[in-house]
């Protein structure tokens, strides 16, 4: 949306040019909560919820695989959470035949540390493990046309992430070699390639390495370096 705005291009022109230049997928960040009431209060300067959805429709039309996200647990209502899921489901239902559209959905709780919402408005992250588990389970039920539901171990930690694997999630995501957004807002959790596999096994599942497009790959033998975060 920002490129379109400063360059004076349409969504189709922008995404077509990016694909021609080699881009084959696009993350679903920036969805936050799609309600414009919420967006006006927590993400001024970002596009409207409808424009976010429109951009995703065009991305799917030109053959780009994307993901969809939700950042909840701040000022949104329960109804706005459900509306968010319904609108994402509707966009996925409109994807061209043969295209992936949204390949995954990821919900994570608002991380409040050092944010303006916390300092100015006193909004804190009060999302419990039970509430996050319910959010993942509801996402699985309400998004039957999105194959993969990813848990956000980065924001909720290993123990809660393990529970979500039994409650609708089928993907732990990546180990995130570098992440500077939610970690700056109080998400301290970290995994290595071996420790994330151990976590999955302890939950009763078999780890599977995958590509961005969820193609299975053989897990190589790795020697890990200790990284001081």
Protein language model regions, located:
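Active-site-proximal loop/turn and secondary-structure-junction residues that shape catalytic pockets
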Residues: 1, 30-33, 70-76, 109-113, ...
């Amino acid at each position: 949306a920002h490129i379109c705005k400063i360059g004076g291009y349409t969504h189709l022109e922008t995404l077509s040019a990016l694909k021609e230049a080699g881009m084959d997928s696009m993350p679903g960040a920036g969805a936050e909560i799609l309600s414009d009431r919420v967006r006006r209060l927590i993400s001024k300067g970002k596009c409207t919820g409808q424009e976010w959805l429109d951009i995703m429709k065009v991305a799917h039309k030109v053959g780009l695989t994307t993901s969809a996200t939700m950042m909840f647990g701040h000022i949104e209502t329960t109804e706005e959470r459900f509306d968010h899921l319904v609108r994402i489901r509707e966009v996925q239902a409109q994807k061209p035949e043969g295209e992936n559209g949204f390949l995954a959905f990821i919900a994570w709780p608002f991380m409040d540390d050092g944010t303006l919402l916390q300092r100015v408005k006193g909004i804190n992250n009060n999302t419990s493990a039970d509430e996050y588990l319910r959010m993942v389970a509801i996402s699985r039920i309400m998004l039957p046309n999105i194959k993969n539901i990813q848990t956000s171990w980065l924001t909720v930690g290993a123990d809660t992430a393990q529970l979500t694997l039994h409650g609708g999630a089928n993907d732990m995501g990546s180990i995130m070699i570098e992440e500077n957004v939610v970690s700056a807002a109080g998400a301290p959790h970290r995994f290595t390639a071996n420790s994330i596999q151990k976590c999955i096994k302890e939950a009763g599942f078999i780890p599977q390495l995958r590509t961005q497009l969820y193609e299975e790959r053989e897990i190589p033998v790795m020697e890990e370096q200790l990284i001081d975060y």
